[in-house]
UniProtKB/Swiss-Prot annotation:
NCBIfam families in alphabetical order: SASP_sspI
Encoding gene per record: sspI
Record protein name field: Small, acid-soluble spore protein I
Induction details: Expressed only in the forespore compartment of sporulating cells.
Compartment(s) of residence: Spore core
Family recorded in the similarity comment: Belongs to the SspI family.
Organism in which the protein naturally occurs: Bacillus mycoides (strain KBAB4) (Bacillus weihenstephanensis)
Length: 69
């Protein structure tokens, strides 16, 4: 039996408003549950694929700074 996690996550949030997406992200981060990490990864993949080069550079800078803390 094969389970498509990426597809399940995308189906679960497809059509959500910005507020709903923010709630999903904040809830996943605040819960601190390891099982939420793959879903956050799928959401980041969507962001990355839809970002232009400047946005990607900005995200990488933010990530780099966050990892230095």
């Amino acid at each position: 039996m094969s389970f498509n996690l990426r597809g399940a996550v995308l189906a679960n949030v497809s059509g959500n408003s910005q507020d709903q997406l923010q709630e999903t992200i904040v809830d996943a981060i605040q819960s601190g549950e390891e099982k939420m990490l793959p879903g956050l990864g799928v959401l980041f993949e969507v962001i990355w694929k839809n970002a232009d080069e400047n946005e990607k550079h900005e995200m990488l800078g933010t990530l780099e700074q966050g990892l230095k803390k």
